[in-house]
Amino acid sequence: MAEVEETLKRLQSQKGVQGIIVVNTEGIPIKSTMDNPTTTQYASLMHSFILKARSTVRDIDPQNDLTFLRIRSKKNEIMVAPDKDYFLIVIQNPTE
């Protein structure tokens, strides 16, 4: 667990990072550097988005899988690294 904590600290120290959320496969936040309402909102919305994106990738090619997802808007950039047991979500300011 110390390795996970160290990785989260390292990511959080990167310029522009606003928050990090680790979500289990059911969409329940396990760890977060953000406040509770924001964590819950991102976890819920990104969980369904990731499942849809993964399904789309597999529909196109059943031998393929989603390995990374990046969404950039005017205000934020959301990066997701899905794994079999959890999803790592990083929210950052793209202009910093």
Curated annotation (Swiss-Prot):
Domain of life: Eukaryota
Gene Ontology CC entries for this record: centrosome; ciliary tip; cilium; cytoplasm; cytoplasmic dynein complex; dynein complex; membrane; microtubule
Pfam family, one: Robl_LC7
Gene3D superfamilies documented for this protein: Dynein light chain 2a, cytoplasmic
Subunit structure: Homodimer. The cytoplasmic dynein 1 complex consists of two catalytic heavy chains (HCs) and a number of non-catalytic subunits presented by intermediate chains (ICs), light intermediate chains (LICs) and light chains (LCs); the composition seems to vary in respect to the IC, LIC and LC composition. The heavy chain homodimer serves as a scaffold for the probable homodimeric assembly of the respective non-catalytic subunits. The ICs and LICs bind directly to the HC dimer and the LCs assemble on the IC dimer. Interacts with DYNLRB2. Interacts with DYNC1I1 and DYNC1I2.
Job description of the protein: Acts as one of several non-catalytic accessory components of the cytoplasmic dynein 1 complex that are thought to be involved in linking dynein to cargos and to adapter proteins that regulate dynein function. Cytoplasmic dynein 1 acts as a motor for the intracellular retrograde motility of vesicles and organelles along microtubules.
The protein's name: Dynein light chain roadblock-type 1
